[in-house]
């Protein structure tokens, strides 16, 4: 589009220049023709006219001078001037060469100037875009390095136990809860906020293991997996330990999940690890039989509680009460 406009402008300018030159040439030609018609023609000098002039120069007034001198015709004068210097006011070869040269020089000059200007503008625009992109990338790089440096330094301070108000990153390099990350034009710089959903849910299911060491080298170990719903956590489990030598240690481990933590054990509403009572002081077979009976009762209670969890009981307090009952049953067995 721009090239077409330049061509039209060049054509219009060319027509204006050509018309002005032609008009000036025509006007000059007319003026010169008028001047050549008005001026007297040069008469060639002849001996006859010389004699006539000498006869007219007589001092006697009675003598009259003859005015019948022979003059060349206008056509002869015109032919003579044409053969010598051409028609007055009519351009010759040199004039036409200059005219055509001027016609060719003007658009050529304009074209060259247009090409140079277009090249310079394009180069300037390209360099401007290049510089802008360079500085933009430099700013982005500096911001990224700054955010990474802040994260590393605050992580080191947090691991060293140093903290301050407005501290963004913690010991693990994650963003502290409630901290505000630096922004630039509405875009957050640096790390991302830790997703709380990625953390393990308190009370989620898993294997629960309890172990106790008996007197005389006897060991008791049991593993029970909670069979309750995932939302309610691991179900309480009781594992009875075998006795060693008739006077070993009995271990009761009640494991269960409460609403506030993932700890094992089921001693009342408080959770945690269940108390392990040792039967080393009693050491008689009757206490061992009573303990075994209490363990059987505890196993029955565990089955009942597991059945309650399978029915979708999510109440943490009721789970804690059941665990408390399991702990009481274990104490009764030890007694």
UniProtKB/Swiss-Prot annotation:
Q: Does the keyword Transcription regulation apply?
A: no
Membrane topology reported for the UniProt record:
Single-pass membrane protein
Biased-composition ranges, Low complexity, are 55-68, 226-241, 249-261, 272-282
Q: What happens when the gene is disrupted?
A: Decreases virulence in Zea mays.
Task: Tell me which UniProt keywords the record has, alphabetically.
Answer: Membrane, Signal, Transmembrane, Transmembrane helix, Virulence
Annotated segments matching region Disordered:
33-84, 226-335
Where are the bilayer-spanning segments?
Answer: 96-116
Instruction: Write the signal peptide boundaries.
Output: 1-24
* Swiss-Prot/TrEMBL GO biological process terms: biological process involved in interaction with host
Relate the assembly described in the record: Homodimer.
What's the name of the protein? Virulence-associated membrane protein 2
Q: Which organism is it from?
A: Mycosarcoma maydis
Instruction: Give the organism's phylogenetic lineage.
Output: Eukaryota, Fungi, Dikarya, Basidiomycota, Ustilaginomycotina
């Amino acid at each position: 589009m721009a090239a077409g406009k330049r061509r039209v402008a060049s054509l219009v300018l060319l027509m204006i220049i050509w018309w002005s030159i032609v008009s000036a040439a025509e006007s000059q030609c007319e003026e010169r023709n008028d001047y050549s018609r008005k001026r007297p023609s040069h008469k060639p000098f002849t001996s006859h006219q010389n004699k006539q002039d000498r006869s007219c120069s007589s001092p006697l007034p009675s003598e009259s001078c003859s005015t019948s001198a022979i003059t060349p015709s206008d056509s002869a004068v015109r032919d003579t001037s044409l053969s010598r210097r051409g028609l007055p006011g009519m351009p010759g070869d040199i004039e036409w060469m200059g005219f055509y040269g001027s016609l060719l020089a003007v658009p050529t000059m304009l074209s060259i100037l247009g090409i140079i200007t277009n090249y310079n503008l394009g180069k300037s625009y390209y360099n401007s875009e290049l510089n802008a992109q360079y500085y933009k990338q430099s700013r982005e790089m500096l911001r990224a390095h700054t955010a990474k440096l802040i994260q590393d330094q605050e992580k080191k301070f947090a691991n060293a136990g140093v903290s301050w108000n407005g501290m963004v990153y913690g010991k693990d390099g994650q963003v502290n809860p409630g901290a505000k990350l630096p922004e630039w034009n509405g875009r957050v710089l640096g790390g991302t906020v830790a997703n709380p959903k990625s953390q393990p849910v308190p009370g989620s299911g898993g294997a629960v293991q309890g172990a106790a060491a008996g007197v005389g080298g006897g060991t008791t170990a049991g593993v029970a997996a909670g069979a309750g719903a995932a939302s309610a956590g691991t179900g309480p489990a009781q594992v009875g330990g075998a006795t060693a030598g008739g006077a070993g240690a009995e271990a009761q481990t009640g494991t269960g999940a409460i609403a506030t933590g993932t700890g094992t054990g089921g001693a009342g509403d408080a959770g945690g690890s269940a108390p392990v009572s040792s039967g080393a002081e009693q050491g008689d077979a009757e206490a061992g039989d009573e303990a075994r009976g209490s363990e059987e009762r505890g196993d029955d209670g565990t089955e009942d509680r597991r059945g309650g969890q399978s029915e979708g009981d999510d109440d943490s307090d009721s789970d804690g009460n059941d665990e408390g009952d399991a702990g009481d049953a274990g104490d009764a067995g030890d007694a």
